[in-house]
């Protein structure tokens, strides 16, 4: 398992934990190929640096593996064996090659980050798009867009995620976005994630509570 989380009283003010509670309390039921889950549509989470730290310290997040994974993504590495060599086995089901997945799009990040650091224009929105409708893929990115904006000398990072497993995947996605923000030579103001579909699988309900 990549990451673990649960809702506790000391975390109730953190917006990430509020989303967990909301899915548990108000989520509707849907059935998919991975099983039954509770879900909500079109939720938004905005996290300050302090709230990010709260999440990272309160979870058993595989930070080293996630750092290695992001580095491989940004280098455009598509060979699953390279991820396995870094101790990352959650891509094994994709076969030997990641087809039109995260590396295809994240390899565009280094030049974009360099451009942002060079220009630092508050009047410009810097955007990375991921995925393409109808493109063959063995794991299409759940992350669809990352936008970098500069407001009064601080970085505002905004992302759109088409689908998010709130209990298992979302903390890791948040950590990836945080690592990306660290490469921008500006203080971070906030990270906002717009969640098209955010869900918790029924077999994780008890653990999440």
Regions found by a protein language model. Give the residues of each.
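Terminal, non-catalytic protein-protein interaction segments that mediate quaternary/complex assembly
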Residues: 2-209
């Amino acid at each position: 398992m990549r990451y673990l989380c649960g809702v506790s009283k000391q975390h109730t003010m953190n917006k990430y934990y509020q989303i967990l509670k909301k899915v548990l309390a108000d989520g509707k039921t849907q059935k998919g190929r991975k099983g039954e889950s509770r879900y909500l549509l079109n939720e938004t989470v905005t996290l300050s640096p302090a709230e990010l730290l709260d999440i990272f310290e309160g979870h058993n997040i595989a930070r080293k593996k996630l750092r290695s994974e992001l580095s491989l993504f940004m280098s455009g590495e598509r060979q699953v064996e390279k991820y396995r060599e870094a101790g990352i086995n959650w891509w094994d089901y994709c076969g030997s090659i990641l087809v039109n997945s995260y590396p295809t799009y994240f390899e565009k990040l280094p030049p974009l980050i360099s451009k942002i650091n060079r220009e630092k224009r508050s009047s410009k929105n810097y955007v990375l798009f991921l995925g393409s409708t109808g493109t063959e893929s063995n794991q299409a990115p759940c992350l669809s867009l990352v936008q970098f904006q500069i407001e009064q000398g601080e970085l505002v990072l905004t992302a759109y995620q088409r689908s998010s497993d709130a209990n298992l995947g979302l903390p890791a996605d948040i950590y990836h976005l945080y690592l990306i923000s660290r490469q921008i030579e500006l203080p971070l103001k906030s990270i906002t994630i717009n969640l098209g579909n955010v869900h918790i699988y029924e077999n994780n309900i008890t653990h999440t509570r």
